[in-house]
A protein has these predicted regions:
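Short N-terminal helix/helix-N-cap motif within the alpha/beta-hydrolase-1
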Residues: 103-104, 231-234
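An acidic/histidine-cluster motif and surrounding catalytic segment
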Residues: 1-95, 99-214
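Terminal low-complexity segments of carbohydrate-biosynthetic enzymes
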Residues: 216-218
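A conserved hydrophobic helix/loop-capping motif in glycosyltransferases and polysaccharide synthases
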Residues: 3-11, 220-229, 236
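Alpha-helical interaction/dimerization surfaces of two-component signaling modules
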Residues: 22, 236-239
Length: 239
């Protein structure tokens, strides 16, 4: 079974319902999102982030919401790196709870992982314009990935992607020596562009603002966060 780490906001727990139903054929590990309030409570985001390098990369200062978003994804990498059930060359799926996946997306994700197993990260979603005619996966499609000439094209969206355990371990080791300085979707800032694949046929999309207002019946019984966010932030500061 594919292991899927899903990031959810505790105040929007009901949004997970649809995703969990769609991912019933995988092993789902809920990860409670770091919030901008938790970051701002520390009073000094430099305790969690390398602001100087981030400003050089972004040409501006990242805000607390962006820092929290990045730390939420790093929390998933840490969980993957520590998962003894996964082999180093196994992929795990990272998803943001509000993603709207296509039908049978878990099986399609497995197919992408099998076909592009030499890549460390396989992006299954994309934000913004699609320069290479990327579109949602349809029943007759085969897994097909793109290699962009303009490597910045990899840095649009991080709501759904596969990451190999050895990459998660490498990133976790890096973060024990340095604080993060990238945003969650700036993949080329923390991983080699030539080792990233972008799905041409996307396995999910983010809801429009109108769709976000729609609330489904929550499945509270299976939302069990495995990580204590406060302790995780303390570890980030200590590292």
């Amino acid at each position: 079974k594919l292991t899927c780490y899903v990031i959810y906001a505790s105040e929007r727990i009901e949004r997970l319902s649809h995703f969990l139903q769609c991912a019933s054929d995988s092993h789902v590990v809920p990860i409670s999102a770091v919030t901008k309030e938790q970051v701002s409570l520390l009073g000094h985001s430099s305790a969690l982030f390398n602001l100087k390098r981030a400003e050089e990369l972004l040409e501006r200062t990242p805000n607390d919401k962006e820092i929290a978003h990045t730390l939420s994804h790093i929390q998933c990498w840490k969980a993957i790196a520590e998962n003894e059930q996964l082999q180093n060359n196994d992929f795990a799926l990272i998803a943001e709870g509000e993603i709207q996946p296509v039908e049978n997306f878990i099986q399609h994700a497995i197919n992408y992982a099998n076909k592009y197993s030499s890549y460390g990260i396989i992006k299954l979603q994309r934000d913004g314009k699609t320069p290479a005619c990327e579109r949602l996966y349809q029943a007759s499609d085969e897994p097909d990935a793109l290699i962009y000439g303009d490597t910045n094209q990899y840095n649009y969206g991080c709501s759904l992607y596969l990451i190999r355990k050895d990459v998660a371990k490498k990133l976790t080791a890096l973060l024990s020596e340095t604080k993060p300085y990238w945003l969650a979707d700036q993949f080329t800032a923390f991983h080699e562009p030539q080792n990233i694949a972008q799905a041409r046929y996307l396995l999910g999309e983010n809801p429009s603002p109108k769709q976000q207002d729609k609330v489904e019946n929550p499945l509270f019984s299976i939302i069990v966060p495995i990580y204590n966010v406060e302790r995780y932030l303390e570890q980030c500061i200590e590292s």
